[in-house]
């Protein structure tokens, strides 16, 4: 399965939804090595992901995350940033706090800094916030105070497997800059 997906990607052919789902499932189940994950990331970066492939990857990643279902009447907001800002402060975290203070329920996704001065997890830890919440704790906080931090490594197990390869490569792929904020 992996070899056919890599072959298609390096030949600049589009992946089907099923191929993407199979790949994400294989990553989640540790059926693909870190080197193979990195190979796919580079091949996809070189080819350029189509809108359909981005949608398929985001959908597959969402179906493989830890679900949250807080009991709130309003739509739940997320202010996940894309990382690598212009050497400014962490805008996505500040936005989450302001939105929650205005009464909008927020599930603020984020992680540690990879390419910027401070990731959301770094900022919140510096403020004394517990970032290692269980799904039940996050749901309760959203219901009671209107905001919870959703630490990506705990809620997105597949992302935990693709980001180390991206970090080792020293390049940004769609997983960090596009897929992360979408899921």
Feature annotation, model-predicted:
Residues 1-88, 106:
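Acidic, glycine/proline-rich low-complexity segments that act as flexible tails and inter-domain linkers
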Residues 41, 90-145:
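A glycine-rich phosphate/pyrophosphate-binding beta-strand-loop-alpha-helix module
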Residues 78-79, 106-110, 131-134, 149-151, ...:
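General beta-strand structural signal in soluble alpha/beta enzymes
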Residues 81-83, 110-116, 155:
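Acidic, glycine-rich active-site loops and adjacent beta-strand->loop/helix elements
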Residues 83-86, 112, 121, 182:
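Gly/Ser/Thr-rich beta-alpha loop segments that engage phosphate groups in nucleotides
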Residues 137-183:
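Phosphate/diphosphate-binding glycine-rich loops and adjacent basic-rich segments that engage nucleotide
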């Amino acid at each position: 399965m992996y070899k056919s997906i890599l072959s298609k990607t390096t030949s600049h052919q589009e992946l089907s939804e099923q191929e993407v789902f199979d790949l994400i499932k294989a990553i989640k189940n540790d059926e693909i090595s870190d080197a193979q994950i990195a190979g796919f990331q580079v091949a996809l970066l070189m080819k350029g992901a189509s809108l359909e492939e981005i949608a398929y990857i985001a959908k597959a990643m969402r179906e493989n995350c830890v679900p949250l279902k807080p009991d709130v009447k309003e739509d739940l907001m997320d202010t996940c940033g894309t990382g690598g800002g212009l050497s400014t402060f962490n805008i996505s975290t500040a936005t989450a706090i302001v939105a929650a203070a205005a009464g909008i329920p927020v599930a603020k996704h984020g992680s540690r800094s990879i390419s910027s001065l401070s990731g959301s997890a770094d900022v919140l830890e510096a403020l004394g916030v517990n970032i290692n919440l269980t799904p039940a704790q996050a749901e309760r906080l959203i219901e009671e105070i209107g905001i919870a931090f959703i630490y990506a490594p705990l809620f997105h197990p597949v992302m935990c497997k693709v980001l180390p390869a991206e970090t080792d490569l020293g390049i940004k792929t769609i997983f960090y800059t596009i897929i992360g904020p979408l899921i």
